């Protein structure tokens, strides 16, 4: 498993397991909405009224509609936490925080 996948996989898996609705922004500006049905190293299957296979290289941002609880493996070199002695670290990703960041970026453009 690559280092990049060690962050993507838990995030996408949490979205899939919790059946969280997501907005997927593509690099060309198109917004797709649905639920993550499945994913692999190269693509994500997004379910709405139909299933769409979206290649990861075309995705800019994935925004969950609600908070997602993520479990990081302790070997993940990219995740730093004050509780490094624990076997796993848990973070909440809040879509409202991501929206604020997105709005600030739009204002700065």
Swiss-Prot record:
Q: Which SUPFAM superfamilies does the record match to this protein?
A: Sm-like ribonucleoproteins
Provide this UniProt record's keywords sorted from A to Z: RNA-binding, Stress response
Biological process, per Gene Ontology: regulation of DNA-templated transcription; regulation of RNA stability; regulation of translation, ncRNA-mediated
What InterPro entries does the annotation carry? Hfq, LSM_dom_sf, Sm
Segments forming domain Sm: 9-68
Keyword field contains RNA-binding: yes
User: What interactions and quaternary structure are annotated?
Assistant: Homohexamer.
The family annotation for this protein states: Belongs to the Hfq family.
Q: What is the name of this protein?
A: RNA-binding protein Hfq
Q: Encoded by which gene? A: hfq
């Amino acid at each position: 498993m690559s280092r990049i996948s060690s962050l993507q996989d838990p995030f996408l898996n949490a979205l899939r397991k919790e059946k969280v609705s997501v907005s997927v922004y593509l690099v060309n500006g198109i917004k797709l909405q649905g639920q993550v049905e499945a994913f692999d190293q190269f693509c994500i299957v997004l379910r709405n009224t139909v299933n769409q296979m979206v290649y990861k290289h075309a995705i800019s941002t994935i925004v969950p509609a609600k908070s997602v609880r993520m479990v990081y493996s302790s070997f993940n070199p990219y995740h730093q936490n004050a509780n490094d002695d624990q076997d796993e670290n848990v973070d909440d990703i809040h879509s409202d925080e991501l929206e604020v960041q997105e709005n600030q970026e739009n204002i700065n453009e």
